[in-house]
Amino acid sequence: MKLLVKAPAKINLSLDVLGKRQDGYHEVKMIMTTIDLADRLELTELAEDRIEILSHNRYVPDDQRNLAYQAAKLLKVKFNVKKGVSITIEKTIPVAAGLAGGSSDAAATLRGLNKLWNLGLTIDELAKLGAEIGSDVSFCVYGGTAIATGRGEEIEHIKTPPSCWVVLAKPHIGVSTADVYGNLKLNRVTHPNVDKMVEVINHGDYKGICDTVGNVLEDVTFAMHPEVARIKSQMKRFGADAVLMSGSGPTVFGLVHHDSRMHRIYNGLKGFCEQVYAVRLLGERETLE
């Protein structure tokens, strides 16, 4: 038996860090929303009791380092599944980009194997399992738009922002999330107004959203990788309505309302940055149907 599952990327419209927890993680408060840039996973049931990861992308690990592998392993162990699975990942989301590509692959694996192996789990149960794999996996199980708190695994759903273009640009560098958080000095940063962002999203206020975007990690990543700051400046210069780094970077995104301006920004960045995408915000949450 075979199943195809979509794994959409996310961006952060607002990201704040409140402090460091006793378990070593940071306490966060952020707003994430899914976008129409997605990996595609093909899950094929195997009679043998093993997990196989396949991908043409050389940056995708084919062992237990892969979060999709970890998701399959978790379900096998928790529910004593004796079957195996082959997971083919068609990678579209850039790797290590601040877009939750690996987390979304894990979430898609949880949703897909729930069907393939007839586990009968609810989406809330899958999200709870996702938290055992990684901080963003719970959100990725649901998709849509949500406030994420705790270490990112506590999810409260809110309305979806008004539809618009999202232009993404990723430089050819990797950013260590651990290094970014390690260099964060909470008493020396400007904290975004996450509550205000929730308010303007719930009112469908596109201009308010553009005025309120913020990411407390930006200045840290910019200091470590000045090319990320340069991409943000270029995107602003080309006329994006709002520009922000997603997650710990290095991907920068711009929100754009008009098609003509989207094309201008996209074409302008293509000569400046290796990976550029123009996609839409996604609509509602994922379902198990």
Swiss-Prot record:
<keyword id="KW-0808">Transferase</keyword>
<dbReference type="Pfam" id="PF08544">
    <property type="entry name" value="GHMP_kinases_C"/>
</dbReference>
<dbReference type="GO" id="GO:0019288">
    <property type="term" value="P:isopentenyl diphosphate biosynthetic process, methylerythritol 4-phosphate pathway"/>
</dbReference>
<dbReference type="InterPro" id="IPR006204">
    <property type="entry name" value="GHMP_kinase_N_dom"/>
</dbReference>
<keyword id="KW-0547">Nucleotide-binding</keyword>
<dbReference type="GO" id="GO:0005524">
    <property type="term" value="F:ATP binding"/>
</dbReference>
<dbReference type="InterPro" id="IPR013750">
    <property type="entry name" value="GHMP_kinase_C_dom"/>
</dbReference>
<feature type="active site">
    <location>
        <position position="136"/>
    </location>
</feature>
<dbReference type="GO" id="GO:0050515">
    <property type="term" value="F:4-(cytidine 5'-diphospho)-2-C-methyl-D-erythritol kinase activity"/>
</dbReference>
<dbReference type="InterPro" id="IPR036554">
    <property type="entry name" value="GHMP_kinase_C_sf"/>
</dbReference>
<keyword id="KW-0414">Isoprene biosynthesis</keyword>
<dbReference type="InterPro" id="IPR014721">
    <property type="entry name" value="Ribsml_uS5_D2-typ_fold_subgr"/>
</dbReference>
<keyword id="KW-0418">Kinase</keyword>
<keyword id="KW-0067">ATP-binding</keyword>
<protein>
    <recommendedName>
        <fullName>4-diphosphocytidyl-2-C-methyl-D-erythritol kinase</fullName>
        <ecNumber>2.7.1.148</ecNumber>
    </recommendedName>
</protein>
<comment type="pathway">
    <text>Isoprenoid biosynthesis; isopentenyl diphosphate biosynthesis via DXP pathway; isopentenyl diphosphate from 1-deoxy-D-xylulose 5-phosphate: step 3/6.</text>
</comment>
<dbReference type="Pfam" id="PF00288">
    <property type="entry name" value="GHMP_kinases_N"/>
</dbReference>
<dbReference type="GO" id="GO:0016114">
    <property type="term" value="P:terpenoid biosynthetic process"/>
</dbReference>
<feature type="active site">
    <location>
        <position position="10"/>
    </location>
</feature>
<dbReference type="InterPro" id="IPR020568">
    <property type="entry name" value="Ribosomal_Su5_D2-typ_SF"/>
</dbReference>
<comment type="similarity">
    <text>Belongs to the GHMP kinase family. IspE subfamily.</text>
</comment>
<comment type="function">
    <text>Catalyzes the phosphorylation of the position 2 hydroxy group of 4-diphosphocytidyl-2C-methyl-D-erythritol.</text>
</comment>
<feature type="binding site">
    <location>
        <begin position="94"/>
        <end position="104"/>
    </location>
    <ligand>
        <name>ATP</name>
    </ligand>
</feature>
<dbReference type="InterPro" id="IPR004424">
    <property type="entry name" value="IspE"/>
</dbReference>
